[in-house]
């Protein structure tokens, strides 16, 4: 695992199942790995708390899967967004394949920003991130 890897989550609750159905994805949430002095953390936009950094060990109940991306991440630039709000509206629009108004962040949109993808191009979903990264050389 290294900073910049994509971390995909598959929660167990009914809301997670609805998100997977709505976004046609195997995952309901994603974030970007940040190794902090050897400790794997994830920087992510979550419904509860908005953009924040959490130790990956504290997120094991959501069945994380780590996908190597080989991408460099601007951590100081990412940390500027800590405390930004989560956007339910953007999350709903992402499920429709539309881009939101960026009044806040939804998880895949924020991960796309951190990974250097065009986060304004479309409504990002966890599945869409995997597909976009797989298609790039």
Spans of model-derived segments:
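Loop/turn positions that initiate beta-strands
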Residues: 3-5
């Amino acid at each position: 695992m290294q900073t910049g890897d994509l971390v995909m989550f598959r929660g167990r609750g009914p809301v997670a199942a609805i998100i997977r159905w709505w976004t046609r994805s195997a995952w309901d949430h994603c974030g970007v790995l940040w190794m902090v002095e050897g400790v794997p953390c994830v920087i992510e936009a979550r419904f509860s708390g908005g953009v924040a950094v959490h130790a990956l060990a504290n997120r094991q109940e959501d069945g994380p899967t780590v996908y190597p991306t080989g991408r460099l991440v601007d951590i100081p630039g990412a940390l500027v967004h800590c405390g930004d709000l989560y956007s339910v509206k953007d999350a709903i629009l992402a499920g429709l394949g539309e881009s939101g108004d960026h009044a806040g962040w939804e998880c895949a949109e924020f991960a796309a920003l951190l990974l250097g993808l065009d986060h304004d191009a479309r409504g990002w979903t966890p599945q869409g991130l995997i597909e976009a990264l797989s298609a790039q050389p």
